[in-house]
């Protein structure tokens, strides 16, 4: 039996997780390393849908970052720690926007009216943060004279393109880590209810394996949420929340119920 489960791939786990909760009873018998590997796979997919597709599409659309900087970014230069630019710029990259407006000596998120994640450049500073529902969340603000040397312009920025690609990879990995944290947090929340159900059905499941069922049960709802985000919220977020909440409870409940009348996994993975 152990040899049979050792042949289960991450693709097999994904297929079962999204389409066959009745077979979750087999997934809870896998080694912990396989479930961890599955979480990393899902984090990669979620990040690719939410971030990777947008970035790749953007880079292809502009003909590469070098072409973008050379031909599409307004001519700019930094002198005496102050930014001078030919025109205002608003550039969407994935789910983020690079905004430049030198009409503001020191720009703030309050100067921007549209929701989104921003890297905003004023004449003397750069601000990073998010605007959501009229509320601003500032991550950091820095003076330009601490980031760039005098004379920095489009040509110098173009020479730094390789560093931008490295930064994109680092951002991807960071977002993957964030997706893993999100999966763990949601699974912990749902496991509170699922644990009660598992006890009521006399499944013999330990808390760790209930948590594992929740991880698998959340896979499809999280994928759907990411796809909706990629499609610029084709379905309103409030409606999508209700849909995925109902779907998650359904998948998890059926996954817990699949263990009724079966031998509980001999070992807890947590």
Where are these regions (language model features)?
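Hydrophobic alpha-helical transmembrane segments
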Residues: 33-54, 109-114, 119, 163-180
